[in-house]
Structures are given as structure tokens and as C-alpha cells.
Amino acid sequence: MKKFILPAAAACLSAAIFALSGCAPQKSPSGVSLMGVQPADVGLVSECDYFVAAEPAATTRVNAAGLHFAGDIQQLYGSENGYPQAVVVAKNSLIVNNPHFLKSFLAEVEENEGWLKTASAETVISAVSSHLPEGTTPTFNAKNLTSEVISRCGIHLVYAADDRERVENFLKEMSDVDEQSVGKVKDEFFCEELGDIVNPPADISVYAPDGAPALALAKLMHEENTFGQTSVSYNVVPSSNIQAYVTGEDPAADICILPLNAASKLLGDGSTYRMLGTVTNGNLYLLSKDGASVTSENIREELNGKTIGVIQLNNVPGLTLKIILEKYDIDYEVIG
């Protein structure tokens, strides 16, 4: 299948510039045109017929911009168990020196899935917002964080020992549509067994991007669970900054949640961090302005000749959409 990247007209460098300057990108006459957009611009870029966004931010934009849910990316992808979107990793030093703590930590992450079904929206929001940088607010609020929205966030812990094949398959699929988007993962990347060593308490730092990944730790943050350590600090940060906490000479994060493709590129050799498991399993949705419905039966008819604005076009959201378009033999071009 042919895939093209078209230059934007003149000095149009982003979806925001297109919207503000009136300088329209070159649209594909056939197939699908893909345009990267910022989360806050979902629903606002006039050139786009559809948008791809992740829950819970998708519901926020539906309510704010008068959009409609048009399609479930997970269903279009075609896997009953979704796909490994975000993974949790831990420093090798922590895995070696205090695996007992990690066992307890992961057990609570498992419990979190059930807790989210019964906790009030206010409790969940308070848990997350209290761990954001001062002066910032979470990507969701009490009006859009319903039990239905949480159910669409794909939050479910799958241990690395049970998820290796699915992870490797999805990495290959992402590489097939953009070989620069992922890194090669070695056997050492997967932490498939934890020991029982218990060492003296330590200070542990945990980082997660705002959105569904942060919800995967909401119970732990609500309870300020330290698991008998000196301290466990939970930090929710903008998704665009998450890689900074696992890179450098002395990375800040002892435990971190980050997108699978980023984890493979930054940590795939297993030399500093190893993957403990997958925590979100697909939470992407196709949104429309006109109430159209996109299914596996009509996807080619509905999307042909249309422009789709995609958050994080070069990461899991955009890569997953490209995988789906290839699956249904739909040509696409990246514009803007």
C-alpha cells in the first residue's frame, strides 16, 4: 500500500496554523488524509471530518466541541483483548533489590481496576489532581468521568510474563507502518519473574502521564500507599514530558508508565528498566462532527476522501490508526 507524506502549503506548519491562517493543507483526493492535532484542538480544526482521541479526553472534547462518538478503534483493530497501549516499567536496581515491594505494588494495581468501578468521580479526580504539578488540573472532571468513560479507558493489568507475545506482535505492527516509531526489544526488556527479597525501606518515585495511565494508579494515589517503604511519591505529569523521567544519567522514576512505542525506543535493551506489565489496553475513539458511524463493514466507504485529525500522530494513536487503515486496504497520506 502506498503511504505518502505531503508538505503543507506555504508556511503552514501545524493544524493550529491551518485553522488560524486559512492556509489549507493539501487534501488527498482518494483514500484518507491524516493530520496531527493537539488534544485541545480536537473538534476545532475545520479541515478535519473526523478526529482520533483517547479516553477520558475524548469525552471531554465530545462535550466541549459538540462531537459524536463515531467508532471504536479497539473494535476496528479487531482484537478482543485490545492492544498494549501503555506499559509500566521499573528500574533494574529496584527489581533486583526489592522485588517483594514490586509484587505488592502490582497487586494493588490489579485491585485498582475493581476500585475504579465503585469509587466516586470526585474521589478519583481528587486522587489524580493532588499528584499533578501545582497549578495544573487533570484532563478530566466530574462531568465527564463517568463509570462508562472509565470502562472505555482500557485499564487492566497484564503481567509481562503473560503479555510478551501480544507486545511483540503489536511492536511489529507499528514497525510495519513506521519502522522509526519503535525500537527493538531484547529478552531482558521483559521482567517475567520477581523474587522475594525484602530490603530495608527506601524512597520510591512513581511517574505516570495524565489521562488513562494516571487512572491506572488512582487507588494507590488515593490511599497514599507506601507499602512499608520510607516513602512512595506518586507524580502525574503531562504526557509530552514522561520520557524525561526515564532518561539521563540518573533517571527520576523508579517506576514509570509510558507508551509502549516510547518504552521500546528508550528502554528496549533492558539495561536500565524492565517492563513489569501492560496497564492500558486501548482507549482510542473516532469522533465525528456529523454523527456518522464507522464500523468494519462501512469503514472504507465512510473514510474515503476524508481528513482525520489525530492526537499524537507519530505515537500509539496515529500508529494504531495506520495499522487499521492498512488492515482494511485504505490508502492514506499524512498532510500538514
Residues covered by each model-derived region:
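Secondary-structure end/capping motifs
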Residues: 95-177
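N-terminal hydrophobic or amphipathic helices and topogenic motifs
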Residues: 2-29, 144-236
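Secondary-structure boundary motif
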Residues: 63, 118, 130, 176, ...
